[in-house]
């Protein structure tokens, strides 16, 4: 029995690389599509936002001499590429999926609106919302917070390469311990890098809980949806 009726699933672009150094790993993409299909078959309405860091990151582009606005726009296009790839993988797995874009670019994807996204989800389609917020200077974490709030999701599931939030980076500090749950106030007080400050504050102010979990372990998405205590829950 699914704990949530409607979710916003946030995936990082880097996670799509799998074992590669760059781009999209077809095996990882197929694994993600299979996990998403599994919870879709339980009747969960699914909205997805994917980053673009496996292709281009706006902020690092600024450090390489690109104008920040142009760099962020290139990053937005990278999220569209990833969204199209995931959409194709979902369709190949037998699931209806639709890509909506924050900036008009028909026929690549339909222009995003809250009402279009909700209508598609209620009709059994998985909706992938690409292009960030459509504006520079906003991360895809902020874009996913915005979309999660707009589509009235019950929760944001932040699929990462680590199994939750720790007191410190577990790869650098062997004494780091994991939180099973933590409040937004505590996240902000400790300066924990769950998401950027704008995204975190948006979720806090709009009472959208986040579950940070390891998406790369097959079966974890279903466990989170079923209410199993894996990962870290962030709440008010």
From Swiss-Prot:
The cross-references to Pfam families, in alphabetical order and at most eight, read: AA_kinase
Q: Where does ATP bind?
A: 10-13, 53, 57, 160, 166, 169
Q: Where in the cell is it found?
A: Cytoplasm
The entry summarizes how activity is regulated as: Inhibited by UTP.
Pathway field? Pyrimidine metabolism; CTP biosynthesis via de novo pathway; UDP from UMP (UMPK route): step 1/1
> Mind naming one GO cellular-component term on file for this protein?
cytoplasm
Sites where the protein binds UMP: 52, 72, 133-140
Q: Which domain of life is it from?
A: Bacteria
Its family remark reads: Belongs to the UMP kinase family.
The entry's function note states: Catalyzes the reversible phosphorylation of UMP to UDP.
UniProt name for this protein: Uridylate kinase
Give the species this sequence originates from. Answer: Bacteroides thetaiotaomicron (strain ATCC 29148 / DSM 2079 / JCM 5827 / CCUG 10774 / NCTC 10582 / VPI-5482 / E50)
The gene name on file is: pyrH
